[in-house]
């Protein structure tokens, strides 16, 4: 019987390594796919590990710049903070992983793709909805969801099948990281009353260990895109990683969040997003300077919907594409410089300037240079308040009657 091909999203961890053996038993040839999303680790060994475990082919693709420009950038411009806190670190990477799974599957003539998600997380939804949107004819296999093993049973299976056991298996935490940030759950973090231990963090310093002097950074934007940091031009992925180090040193971007998952449960996770939080803060301030009032007041409603769509795995939905078009239109004049003070866990904007600034000092000042027409206020107030005045007159007459 001829074996079918399946492309597996491979991380090098226990779950996806065991999945290779499990899929082999189901008569599949496995093609492993690992993506470098900017987690800051050497992933060459992951490619080789997949082959040693049993994959017939293994890909390791650097997608950092694609992730930065086509995924993280939109999240920054839309100020995506799920439930006001979470910058969608993991949610942003899933549609890109799904896209590459489909591309490799079509290239290799595979009939199926597979992922290592459990049956109680958001990621299974994000992967499978994205894959269905890109190629509805591919079979999607979720080994971890299907086998329903305990951790002990999974380890026993790995030992029986000579699957290497990761040296960090005794770590209580489940971690996902890319250049937009780091998420951490499980272990003591499952108790929402327990303070996160310091070893739960990697990208940021504790406030007690941060410098006692602030550091200032100037971020340059062109049409809504961060392009320079302290006067130096960077590709977006490098700018984000550089800012991660700068802001992380000052403890910026630590987030402790009890969130409402898509699958109906609450979970407690700890996030580190130093660059994401700094860029979102700076970008919002530049928009305040350059967007007209009507757009500035309407855009947050669109941002909320974009955030929900991304969190819920609907990156490739028609609505998300339509809202993205609106978002891009708003960014044409978001060009300028923002000065940010990094200090003791805070990214504080202390200055902003733009050639497209709608702030006119001669209209705003209270000095002798004031050019605002104060006499125009009388007529404006009369017309602006007229509906309220008429309503009051009518209802007072009824009361008197």
UniProtKB/Swiss-Prot annotation:
Annotated residues that bind ATP are located at 9-17, 116
Give the EC number(s) listed in the UniProt record: 6.3.4.5
- Which GO cellular component term is one of those annotated? cytoplasm
According to UniProt, this protein's pathway is: Amino-acid biosynthesis; L-arginine biosynthesis; L-arginine from L-ornithine and carbamoyl phosphate: step 2/3
**GO annotation (BP), single:** argininosuccinate metabolic process
Its main localization is cytoplasm
Q: Which UniProt keywords apply?
A: Amino-acid biosynthesis, Arginine biosynthesis, ATP-binding, Cytoplasm, Ligase, Nucleotide-binding
Q: How does it assemble?
A: Homotetramer.
What is the protein name given in its UniProt record?
A: Argininosuccinate synthase
- Species this protein is from: Bacillus cereus (strain AH820)
Organism lineage reads as: Bacteria, Bacillati, Bacillota, Bacilli, Bacillales
The gene that this protein is the product of is: argG
């Amino acid at each position: 019987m001829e074996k079918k091909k399946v492309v597996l999203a491979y991380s090098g961890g226990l779950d996806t390594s065991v999945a290779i053996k499990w899929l082999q038993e189901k008569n599949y040839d496995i093609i492993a796919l690992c993506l470098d999303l900017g987690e800051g680790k050497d992933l060459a060994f992951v490619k080789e590990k997949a082959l040693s475990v049993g994959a017939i082919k293994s890909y390791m693709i650097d997608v950092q710049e694609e992730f930065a420009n086509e995924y993280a950038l939109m999240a920054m411009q839309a100020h995506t903070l799920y439930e006001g806190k979470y910058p969608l670190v993991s949610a942003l990477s899933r549609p890109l992983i799904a896209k590459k799974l489909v591309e490799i599957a079509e290239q290799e003539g595979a009939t199926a793709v597979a992922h290592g998600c459990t049956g109680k997380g958001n990621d299974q939804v994000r992967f499978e909805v994205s894959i269905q949107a890109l190629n509805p004819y591919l079979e999607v296999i979720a080994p971890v969801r299907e086998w329903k093993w305990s951790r002990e049973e999974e380890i026993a299976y790995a030992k029986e099948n000579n699957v290497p056991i990761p040296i960090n298996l005794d770590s209580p935490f489940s971690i996902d990281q890319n250049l937009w940030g780091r998420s951490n759950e499980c272990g003591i973090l499952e108790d929402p009353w327990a303070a996160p231990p310091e070893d739960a963090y990697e990208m940021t310093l504790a406030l007690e260990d941060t410098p006692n002097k602030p550091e200032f950074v100037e971020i340059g934007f062109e049409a809504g895109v961060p392009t320079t940091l302290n006067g130096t031009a960077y590709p977006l992925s490098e700018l984000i990683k550089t800012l991660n180090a700068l802001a992380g040193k000052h403890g910026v971007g630590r987030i402790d969040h009890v969130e409402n998952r898509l699958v109906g449960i609450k979970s407690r996770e700890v996030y580190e997003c130093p660059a994401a939080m700094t860029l979102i803060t700076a970008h919002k301030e530049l928009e305040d300077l350059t967007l007209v009032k009507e757009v500035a007041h309407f855009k947050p409603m669109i941002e909320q919907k974009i955030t929900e769509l991304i969190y819920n795995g609907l990156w490739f939905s028609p609505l998300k594409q339509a809202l993205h078009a609106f978002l891009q239109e708003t960014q044409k004049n978001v060009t300028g410089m923002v000065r940010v003070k990094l200090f003791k866990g805070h990214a504080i904007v202390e200055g902003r300037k733009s050639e497209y600034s709608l702030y006119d000092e001669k209209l705003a000042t209270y000095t002798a240079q004031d050019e605002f027409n104060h006499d125009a206020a009388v007529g404006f107030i009369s017309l602006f308040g007229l509906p309220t005045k008429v309503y009051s007159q009518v209802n007072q007459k009824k009361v008197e009657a």
